[in-house]
């Protein structure tokens, strides 16, 4: 189904950023997003979008750790971004699926005047994710996944830098990648690759327990990604698939933050 769409989104965000488990910044900001796109659906499950996005970010407050030698100067920013996105999904359910896979990929060019960024060539980003479910019987399932994002170019805005953390992608920032064991946002280098494996057992009709582990690699040069910094994490979780959305709690650990924390999620996201 071909469709031409226009959308406007306003968000008021209160965001904490961490460095290896220690909070370094807190910022509140307003985000205005205006987007126009053309989309089509092929073969029932495959969808693509091509479009132009305008974003304006206005920072109101910045709190930072006094140990930070050079706190960032967060001035109002605007961007004109070109994007193409692809999404192919055969999952049988949005939450707690029992079969299928979900593949997403995209490429975005970031500019501040539709041609350049700060007087030089624009920077760009590539993201690819693959999540799948393999069930063994009616109760047990294995869920492998891969998430990656690569930034190309120089002078990359901090607002679009790679970040990881949380149980689901894009919870706090659109380009945020999930990572078991880290429940807040941790900035990463220009190339980021994450491999994950979750074991899930259904106890009763709507009750689940799970054990998830993942490995992340980050480096500023994608061609040397396997020589980059390795990050490990895991969590043990319980979930209830309620009529109001998933009610979940988990406890996790990561060597990157070297701490264990409890995480709670209530309802749809």
Give the positions of each predicted feature:
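Sequence/structural signature of outer-membrane beta-barrel proteins
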Residues: 11-17, 55-61, 89-93, 108-116, ...
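C-terminal outer-membrane beta-barrel translocator/porin domains of Gram-negative envelope proteins
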Residues: 83-87, 91-203
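Residues on the lipid-exposed face of transmembrane beta-strands in outer-membrane beta-barrel proteins
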Residues: 8, 36-40, 52, 84-88, ...
